[in-house]
Amino acid sequence: MVSSFSSKRLGDTMDSLALGSNWAGGVAIVLFLAPLALHLVSSYLFPSTSTVINSGRAWDIFRTTAKKRFRSDAARLLQNGFEKSPDAFRILTDNGPLLVLSPRYAREVRSDDRLSLDHFIASEFHPDIPGFEPFKLILDPRNPLNTILKTSLTQALEDLSVEVADALSTALTDDSEWHEISPCQTALKLVAQMASKAFIGPEKCRDPKWHNVIITYTHNVYRAAQALHFWPKFLRPIVARFLPACQTLQAQIAEAREILEPLVAQRRADRACRAAQGKPVPSRADVIDWLEDSHGDQPYDPVAAQLLLSFAAIHGTSNLLAQALMDLCTAPDLIRDIRAEITSVLGDAGLTRAALYRLKLMDSALKESQRLAPNRLLSMGRIAQSDMHLSDGLRIPRGTTLMVSAHAMWEPQIYPDPRRYDGYRFYKLRQVPGQEGQHQLVSATEKHMGFGYGKHACPGRFFAAAEIKVALCHILLKYDLEHRGGGPPPRVWSQGIHLFPDPTARIRVRRRKEEISL
């Protein structure tokens, strides 16, 4: 199944690596350090014990060709790797060598404290380089964001419906004639507005400038991080000074501070005033106040925290919503059945957390979309903090970067006819006695690692699932959907191990009279 995903280049890599007007100084530095680079890179990238699937040619000291091939054809490389070595192999990624493990190792990796997720994320996103400051929070033991994602955010669900209705009125309009829309752009707008309501409250949640910052910062983080990956680690802080993508990140953080810091200051002043008057200080149901409560008098950077939350919450959620919309367009009978489920469940209970849980067919359709197009081909990224051996004797040296393949989601022994979208698949599995709770969208298992697996499974998956379900309730009740005629359904795009819905895809929608009012 991995090889069935289409692989398309998303822009000219060399443009991303341009060093701007100061290129001459950067080149001089690189030439000066080249002899040292020769020694360090060759010894670091290719230790004698490594067998690398795409090692490249010996003369390519920075392995640029191998890295480019990984970014453009990772699915095929991974398939070749498992054909040669079904349990584990090494592959050269754009960020160095990676040990790829079979899904059978997922249970061992999921809870081993010698394997660090935090250090893996830090290695991907350069927290010590200007522009990437939000990622410093990942290594801060006081960071409360995981707790907020797991627990507090679910308190904000009641407000999401209002934001979806507002966003849809402009994104899809009230036009009762068929018209085309971009599912990717529509999903981004909806998720950005819903997340903003939960993260920063009502004052700025509809601010288009804030939406633009949190959407484009995530895109630019990936662009800048991947551009830096083409350089040896010891050169990246130097290269970043001249890299336009890194300069863009710094400008966006400054813009985020201009928007958010006055709001945070006003909140703090209001809280201090109430406390001085002896009045109770209420905590609003948004991340600004939850961060204030959790930090107390300890200093922290609220803007960095908001950008990190947005990075984690927006694009993955919007990608799943967009993919689900495109998949549903291939299954009009499924749309009809989900619409009937929404009408029945919400007609009785209204739009509540309990009602969202009862939308089991919708949940199944979403989980199936995620099965076919997860955010990554590989999951459970870790860095070994000490030398270790797995149960079968596989040795993992200290400092090894590893990930577990997600290809169990496309195994016919686990999911019959795995290439086919079947929105009823997980609904039927939940009818099996004893498996009612094992096949929910938020269930993270070794057979479905769409949200990861183990103690580091995505902490925001409950909030993400709720956002998407609220959005789909509005969309399916209020609009008819169909694919634009004249061709097959859009295919999933890939870059490296990352998967995402076709950003050029269009679907047709028209306003309909909803059976119940939300």
Swiss-Prot record:
GO terms for biological process: secondary metabolic process; terpenoid biosynthetic process. Keywords: Heme, Iron, Membrane, Metal-binding, Monooxygenase, Oxidoreductase, Transmembrane, Transmembrane helix. CDD domains: CYP503A1-like. GO terms for cellular component: membrane. It is found in: Membrane. The keyword Transmembrane applies. InterPro entries: Cyt_P450, Cyt_P450_CS, Cyt_P450_E_grp-IV, Cyt_P450_sf. Heme binds at C458. Disulfide bonds: none annotated. Pfam families: p450. Pyripyropene A and its derivatives have very unique characteristics of selectively inhibiting the acyl-coenzyme A:cholesterol acyltransferase 2 (ACAT2) isozyme. Therefore, pyripyropenes are expected to be developed as a new type of anti-atherosclerotic agent. Furthermore, pyripyropenes have been shown to exhibit anti-angiogenic activity against human umbilical vein endothelial cells. Finally, pyripyropene A also exhibits insecticidal properties. Pathway: Secondary metabolite biosynthesis; terpenoid biosynthesis. One of its GO terms (molecular function) is monooxygenase activity. Its main location: membrane. Its EC number is 1.-.-.-. It is a single-pass membrane protein. It comes from the Eukaryota. Its cofactor is heme. It is an enzyme of class 1 (oxidoreductase). The chain crosses the membrane at residues 26-46. Cytochrome P450 monooxygenase; part of the gene cluster that mediates the biosynthesis of pyripyropene A, a specific human acyl-coenzyme A:cholesterol acyltransferase 2 inhibitor. The first step of the pathway is the synthesis of nicotinyl-CoA from nicotinic acid by the nicotinic acid-CoA ligase pyr1. Nicotinyl-CoA is then a substrate of polyketide synthase pyr2 to produce 4-hydroxy-6-(3-pyridinyl)-2H-pyran-2-one (HPPO) which is further prenylated by the polyprenyl transferase pyr6 to yield farnesyl-HPPO. Belongs to the cytochrome P450 family. This is Cytochrome P450 monooxygenase pyr3.
